[in-house]
């Protein structure tokens, strides 16, 4: 019997202002853990899988139940320790210490590979936390939408003079992360053709308004794209097909998309990528009997897909890796020039990271969408001179369906995060919001990740693989008084390829919270500016000087 599987479970976080725990500092992590497993949020909630292949919220259902039990009794001077999804200890700390400290899927580097991890996983000794799955701040696909939108806007600026109309994106994957591509693409003005082997995922994206149409053949999908481009109104199409098959077929037909990328779960060849010619049932059976054969077949198909991406790049498509490590998998399978197309961070996002700009997100613990709409208005009020941000907030309200507890994401940086958080805390204090807000972020941020094939690819000083930075980030956020802090390994790109940290803090309207958010939400993005200034980026150095950061080795 698999202790991680229970189809009878249906988890819905409490709404409103009534507490189940002893304070909002423990109610918040409880609600956010539960929200990660909401049926409209998680990919496979019955298996505790939130997104990203096997990214889980808790190690098994016994651990989940015990975490909830402990949070309900936890005092405001105690800290719960969670080791790979398992609650292992409660310790007396102090009121400004985190209420929860989390470490997920961390392995000593020599053993940091999927083979060793999968053995531990089967024995119930580890859990893959992805990034926000095991750190309890996943907000559904919205969590990656703006970052994807910003990337596609940058693609349009670099390659098409800022005009995306009449252009289309080819991609793969409509899971928790990949599902953002279709909506983000159309918001940026592109049509999008996304390949997905799991029809339930396409239907889920249709239901939550992330995909406009479904197609069951390539010809049908291309006709939809062509019609949209002719009309000038972008459309997103979920095509029920294997991405490797479709990408290679387009090369064969001589059809070149304007943009090519991919967000299949290629980071996990055993659980995340369906080999060409295989059914999902066949793959599920083979995972139980011959894991090595599954991995070999999946990586062979990834090699086919990456080769097609290279061919489409040669034919004129703007081609980019979107951080799922598919280039690495193809390289290991013989595609020696797999890294000839760039990752999205060095190509489009790094200048934002240099100013500490990244995926700032917040969630209304009340469950009331009006609380989010009021905070949207507050963001516009406090950042009046950023029409791009205002446009994003307007589009998000109009086009993004909330999943689980209402939430919002917007990319802001060092200059704005702390003051926005303090304003939100004041709104809770004054009764403008019906319950406290939690503020967090993706681990994909400027100072919180070391990932040489994604966020820290091609650092100008060669420090791509130095992982001191996310460790320092986690330590500083803990010292600064975050409500919960997490330190993970393997998110996004898989075992052995990344280390990263997460942070969440509660705005409960108290003066103590105002002080904590002021520290945490200044220091957290400041570590990103520090990291990039240390690597030699002039934008980061200038930002550090402008904001008065004390960086001892930064020369005037």
From Swiss-Prot:
Its cofactor is NAD(+). It is an enzyme of class 4 (lyase). Pfam families: Urocanase, Urocanase_C, Urocanase_N. Keywords: Cytoplasm, Histidine metabolism, Lyase, NAD. InterPro entries: Urocanase, Urocanase-like, Urocanase_C, Urocanase_central_sf, Urocanase_CS, Urocanase_N, Urocanase_Rossmann-like, Urocanase_sf. It is found in: Cytoplasm. Binds 1 NAD(+) per subunit. Gene3D superfamilies: Urocanase like domains (3.40.50.10730), Urocanase superfamily (3.40.1770.10). Pathway: Amino-acid degradation; L-histidine degradation into L-glutamate; N-formimidoyl-L-glutamate from L-histidine: step 2/3. The active site is at residue 410. It catalyses: 4-imidazolone-5-propanoate = trans-urocanate + H2O. Its main location: cytoplasm. NAD(+) binds at residues 52-53, 130, 176-178, 196, 201, 242-243, 263-267, 273-274, 322, 492. It comes from the Bacteria. GO terms for biological process: L-histidine catabolic process to glutamate and formamide; L-histidine catabolic process to glutamate and formate. GO terms for molecular function: urocanate hydratase activity. GO terms for cellular component: cytoplasm. SUPFAM superfamilies: Urocanase (SSF111326). Its EC number is 4.2.1.49. Catalyzes the conversion of urocanate to 4-imidazolone-5-propionate. Belongs to the urocanase family. HAMAP family: HutU. This is Urocanate hydratase. It comes from Shewanella sp. (strain MR-7).
């Amino acid at each position: 019997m698999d202790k991680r599987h229970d189809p009878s479970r249906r988890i819905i976080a409490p709404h409103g202002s009534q507490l189940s725990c002893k304070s909002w500092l423990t109610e918040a992590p409880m609600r956010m853990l539960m929200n990660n497993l909401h049926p409209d949020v998680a990919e496979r909630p019955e298996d505790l899988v939130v997104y990203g292949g096997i990214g889980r919220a808790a190690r098994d259902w016994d651990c989940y139940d015990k975490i909830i039990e402990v949070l309900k009794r936890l005092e405001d001077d105690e800290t719960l320790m969670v080791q790979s999804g398992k609650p292992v200890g409660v310790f007396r700390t102090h009121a400004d210490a985190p209420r929860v400290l989390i470490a997920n899927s961390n392995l000593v580097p020599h053993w940091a590979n999927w083979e060793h991890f999968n053995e531990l996983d089967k024995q119930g000794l580890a859990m893959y936390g992805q990034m926000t799955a095991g750190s309890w701040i996943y907000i559904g696909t919205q969590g990656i939408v703006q970052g994807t939108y910003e990337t596609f806007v940058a693609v349009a600026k670099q390659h098409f003079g800022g005009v995306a109309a009449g252009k289309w994106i080819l991609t793969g994957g409509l899971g928790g992360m990949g599902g953002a591509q279709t909506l983000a693409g159309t918001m940026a003005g592109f049509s999008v053709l996304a390949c997905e082997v799991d029809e339930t995922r396409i239907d889920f994206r249709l239901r939550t308004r992330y995909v406009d149409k479904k197609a069951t053949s390539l010809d049908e999908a291309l006709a939809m794209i062509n019609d949209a481009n002719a009309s000038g109104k972008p459309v997103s199409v979920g095509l029920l097909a294997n991405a490797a098959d479709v990408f290679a077929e387009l090369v064969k037909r001589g059809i070149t998309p304007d943009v090519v990328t991919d967000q299949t779960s290629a980071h996990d060849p055993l659980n995340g990528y369906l080999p060409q010619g295989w059914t999902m049932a066949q793959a599920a059976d083979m995972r139980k009997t011959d894991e090595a054969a599954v991995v070999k077949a999946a990586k062979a198909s990834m090699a086919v897909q990456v080769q097609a991406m290279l061919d489409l790049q040669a034919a004129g498509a703007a081609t980019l890796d979107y951080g799922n490590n598919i280039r690495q998998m193809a390289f290991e399978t013989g595609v020696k020039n797999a890294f000839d197309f760039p990752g999205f961070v060095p190509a489009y996002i790094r200048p934002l990271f240099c100013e500490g700009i990244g995926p700032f997100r917040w969630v209304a613990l009340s469950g009331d969408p009006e609380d989010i709409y009021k905070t949207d208005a507050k963001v516009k009020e406090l950042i009046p001179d950023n029409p791009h941000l205002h446009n994003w907030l307007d589009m998000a309200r109009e086009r993004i369906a909330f999943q689980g507890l209402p939430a919002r994401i917007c990319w802001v940086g060092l200059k704005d995060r702390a003051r926005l958080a303090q304003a939100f805390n004041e709104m809770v204090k004054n009764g403008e919001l019906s319950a406290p807000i939690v503020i967090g972020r993706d681990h994909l941020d400027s100072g919180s990740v070391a990932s040489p094939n994604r966020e820290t690819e091609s650092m100008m000083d060669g420090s791509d693989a130095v992982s001191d930075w996310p460790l320092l980030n986690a330590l500083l956020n803990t010292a600064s008084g975050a409500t919960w802090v997490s330190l993970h390994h393997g998110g996004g790109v898989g075992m052995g390829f990344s280390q990263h940290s997460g942070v969440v803090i509660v705005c409960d309207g108290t003066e103590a919270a105002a002080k904590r958010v002021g520290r945490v939400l200044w220091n957290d993005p400041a570590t990103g500016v520090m990291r990039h200034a240390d690597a030699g980026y002039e934008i980061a150095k200038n930002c550090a000087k402008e904001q008065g950061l004390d960086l001892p080795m930064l020369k005037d």
